[in-house]
Amino acid sequence: MTILRKSHPLLKIINHSLIDLPTPSNISSWWNFGSLLGICLMIQIITGLFLAMHYTSDTTTAFSSVTHICRDVNYGWLIRYIHANGASMFFICLFIHVGRGIYYGXXMLNETWNIGIILFLTTMATAFVGYVLPWGQMSFWGATVITNLLSAIPYVGTTLVEWIWGGFSVDKATLTRFFTFHFILPFIITALVLVHLLFLHETGSNNPSGLNSNADKIPFHPYYTIKDLLGIFMLLLALMTLVLFFPDILGDPDNYIPANPLNTPAHIKPEWYFLFAYAILRSIPNKLGGVLALLLSILILAAFPLLNTSKQHGLMYRPITQTLYWIFIANLFILTWIGGQPVEHPFIMIGQISSILYFTIIVILMPMASMIENNVLKLHV
């Protein structure tokens, strides 16, 4: 008689995805971040549901409802801070996951990579609309500035912005629809995650060597379930340390001031995980140019499979491209720092140089380095 998990129509799917899944025997801890993202998504949905039970999406009561959650709801402060800092952990895992994909050549699994980019954009949209909900100063002005960028679109821009706002400024209608989007998007993300995994399991996982690993695979359970559990415990330790000791370290103090349309904060800036894109946006003096650069800073990921000129899979044995990769990562940190700085000398110049370098490395230097490496290694196959 067949084991139930192998014959039952529903359990069979779970079995093929999480238990008997053939997995390369040599994948490192960089492969843990996929499962960590799954855990982050679960944490965010659960805490988000509990917050939604007490939150009111009305401009007059939104700020007080968040205060009420923190002061009067049992462990409301804990749920709120897990949700706020959980978003930061989510993006840390997301950046590492994408970075690992670039380093080990996972971009060549086209469908998985493209769904991943859609997931990245959807997660960014979710985080943006979520940041507006507490209706503090930075929530209000962040929403105003970022939605206003759409007015740079020729001909339809202004109409589009007013349509998104539901009026002539960010107001009650905007907050209500943003709450709706913030509620529904995580479930859309969950559906996209399943599609992401479906495509991944069609081809099988990549591995650090970049070679075909079909000859040496092991079952996912118990080997990688145990390995993932260690990662999950470390993630929870980091998250709870952040929540219980430094809950506001990644937030903005201005968001503890209720939204006031008549008073603009000194420095309007988004959450830390958007700062790199915000720095690229600000580095271009033209409004439409800035918006296009902002979009391209994320959509350039879709060009990775097209720009790949190497005969090898991944950067494991490619020292020139490896050096460029780490310069690119360092440059991302610089952009993140610049995004949080005021618009003045020397930050403007540093931001512009970093933005140029960001695109130059991806579009010109990495493909050139790959071609040089092919020639040096005589890879003309």
From Swiss-Prot:
Binds 2 heme b groups non-covalently. Keywords: Electron transport, Heme, Iron, Membrane, Metal-binding, Mitochondrion, Mitochondrion inner membrane, Respiratory chain, Transmembrane, Transmembrane helix, Transport, Ubiquinone. It is a multi-pass membrane protein. The keyword Coiled coil does not apply. Heme b b566 binds at H97, H196. InterPro entries: Cyt_b/b6_C, Cyt_b/b6_C_sf, Cyt_b/b6_N, Cytb/b6-like_sf, Cytochrome_b, Cytochrome_b_C_euk/bac, Cytochrome_b_N_euk/bac, Di-haem_cyt_TM. It comes from the Eukaryota. The chain crosses the membrane at residues 33-53, 77-98, 113-133, 178-198, 226-246, 288-308, 320-340, 347-367. The keyword Coiled coil does not apply. Pfam families: Cytochrom_B_C, Cytochrome_B. GO terms for cellular component: mitochondrial inner membrane; respiratory chain complex III. A ubiquinone binds at H201. One of its GO terms (biological process) is mitochondrial electron transport, ubiquinol to cytochrome c. One of its GO terms (molecular function) is metal ion binding. Heme b b562 binds at H83, H182. Its cofactor is heme b. Its main location: mitochondrion. It is found in: Mitochondrion inner membrane. Component of the ubiquinol-cytochrome c reductase complex (complex III or cytochrome b-c1 complex) that is part of the mitochondrial respiratory chain. The b-c1 complex mediates electron transfer from ubiquinol to cytochrome c. Contributes to the generation of a proton gradient across the mitochondrial membrane that is then used for ATP synthesis. Belongs to the cytochrome b family. Heme 1 (or BL or b562) is low-potential and absorbs at about 562 nm, and heme 2 (or BH or b566) is high-potential and absorbs at about 566 nm. The cytochrome bc1 complex contains 11 subunits: 3 respiratory subunits (MT-CYB, CYC1 and UQCRFS1), 2 core proteins (UQCRC1 and UQCRC2) and 6 low-molecular weight proteins (UQCRH/QCR6, UQCRB/QCR7, UQCRQ/QCR8, UQCR10/QCR9, UQCR11/QCR10 and a cleavage product of UQCRFS1). This cytochrome bc1 complex then forms a dimer. This is Cytochrome b. It comes from Scolomys juruaense. The gene is MT-CYB.
